[in-house]
Amino acid sequence: MKNMKIGTVIGLCLLLSFFFGTSAKAESITSPDGQLKLNFSVNAQGEPVYELSYKGKEVIKPSKLGLELKNDPGLMNGFTLIDTKTATFDETWQPVWGEVKSIRNHYNEMAVTLNQKAQGRNLIICFRLYNDGLGFRYEFPQQKNLNYFVIKEEHSQFAMAGDHTAFWIPGDYDTQEYDYTESKLSEIRGLLQGAITPNASQTPFSPTGVQTSLQMKTADGLYINLHEAALIDYSCMHLNLDDQNLVFESWLTPDAKGDKGYMQTPCRSPWRTVIVSDDARDILASKLTLNLNEPCIYEDVSWIKPVKYIGVWWEMITGKGSWSYTDDVYSVKLGQTDYSKTKPNERHSANNDKVKRYIDFASEHGFDQVLVEGWNEGWEDWFGNSKDYVFDFVTPYPDFDVKMLNAYAKEKGVKLMMHHETSASVRNYERHLDKAYQFMIDNGYNAVKSGYVGNIIPRGEHHYGQWMNNHYLYAVEKAAEYKICVNAHEATRPTGLCRTYPNLIGNESARGTEYEAFAGNKPFHTTLLPFTRQIGGPMDYTPGIFDTKLSFLSGDHSFVRTTLAKQLALYVTMYSPLQMAADFPESYERHMDAFQFIKEVAVDWDDSKYLEAEPGDYITVARKAKGTDNWFVGGITDENPRTSAFTLDFLEPGKQYVATLYADGKDADFEKNPTSYQIKKGLVTNKNKMSVKLARSGGFAVSLIEATPADLKTIRKWK
């Protein structure tokens, strides 16, 4: 038996040698703290291979790298290692806006140059190892035998060391708006079809394909996140799982012809990222994605400001109001359809009187802007017709007076936020972009929410292909010429480009609050988004729904699957420099004591502390408001009630703060009694501890405001 075991081991080694070969020269680097180690080699077939470990544990088993080209020999094998360069980099930089005031960018780098002798071509693979993870990318130098080329597929592997627990959504070329599924990797195939729910545009591609950012947890307590950074002039990467061997491989989004990238050297791929830790809080605190992006390209950023806003959007989403002006028209031809001769449907939300009321509410309660969707002609047949000339972005409906409303808003110290729904007719949008942005400037707008609902025109292109990624960035760069900030919905999920282009102030790119009015989001949804979608950048999640039962609707309908207190907590746990109070003014007027937290909470931060975290279960975060000593804490849970316990040791020693706690009531329940909440106030210091009970799908929020002399006399100590 002993000899048989030895023979088996030898046979296994020979088999592994066949697949991964041996390298004439192996290279390695470690992270600055020495906890992460990367090994790189070229095997006997000339294939690049890397592996990654953390504190001695396997994170990525030996995995191959390379690209398959169309009409050219691939960059897959036949390589020899001809040069290795290493470097160390350490800087601290300040984001224009963000979770923290400054970010350390500290890594060890190894760039390997590979020569493919048979084709006379060189390929560089650059690895950067941070304390919190790895980034690697392909670099294609300009050379005689590699000038213009077309990518058929990128074959970057991520070989898992076990059947990890994963939190995933189906791979799709056109939408990320799916509910998350928690399962073992080996279970994805059996669950994926059931996880594909209807959407306005969707193209799933594989029975084991999933999207990034993919969060996983290993049996021995490692948290592993796979994503990409600096997605520029390239197709979005998905992951396709070989579930027999538990190996993920990159799967790029194709164009209308099925090609996955048109390249001209010198050029490079986005970074492929692996964030890893044995503490879930480190995944949330990681700045690896931002660090792998280039610095801000704008010299003047004074015009880029975080925003807290309200708007008429929730009326339309819930069906209480309408984007369209009339029911008389079923086929619109811009410039020919005469809306003055049609009968208003009386449900059009973007009308003068209603918008003025929202402006008044914003002014009274300190909001910066009011978003108005449905203001412009064309909504009567905007969707489902693959219509090219669907909007012109400058012509308002008869009941929306652009100049009057913007003047009224200016008097009140408020701005209107523009809305550009493209109906995915991207060619039409680009034709009108300069005119649309100039119209904004002429009328006092400085921010726009753009949308890409439906199948892309040019027909056959996908939301996440190279062509569309170039469009999204073009719209952002063009907006900067007019000093306009962009909040892009239905666009590619972020990859940290907001560092380079900070006027990209928001993205949706996931299943947001709107789905609470359609089919509902799972209670654990917002405990996952910071681990997944938000790894690449902030999300315009649009929280703040107080009337969670949607009591104004009749009959059977969806409801918001959280407590009211959890809605408050989301302003802290779901980071964004663009935060909406999405509910109706009258909903807030019924709960003005709870609404106080939304009014006070900041949207830009000097510091953030992740106090508690477990993907799919709970998150507790403390953040320090930009330029102040005030802190805000938010905590949320999934469908399971829990008790959150934390200390206030992040507060400045020697100072006293007024703590106001907004928590679930004793009888709170997201299904039975979601609006039950309690408010408690007291004086605290950095030595205080807090223990808060959270209901099912519940939450809590705390404001910690530096105490005034009057506060010290009138407010009791925290008990």
What function would you assign to each model-found segment?
Residues K681-K719:
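C-terminal beta-strand-rich structural cap/linker in extracellular carbohydrate-active enzymes
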Residues S28-D300, S676:
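N-terminal accessory beta-strand-rich subdomains and adjacent acidic, glycine-rich linkers
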Residues V112, D583-F632, I636, D667-N673:
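Glycan-recognition and catalytic regions of carbohydrate-active enzymes
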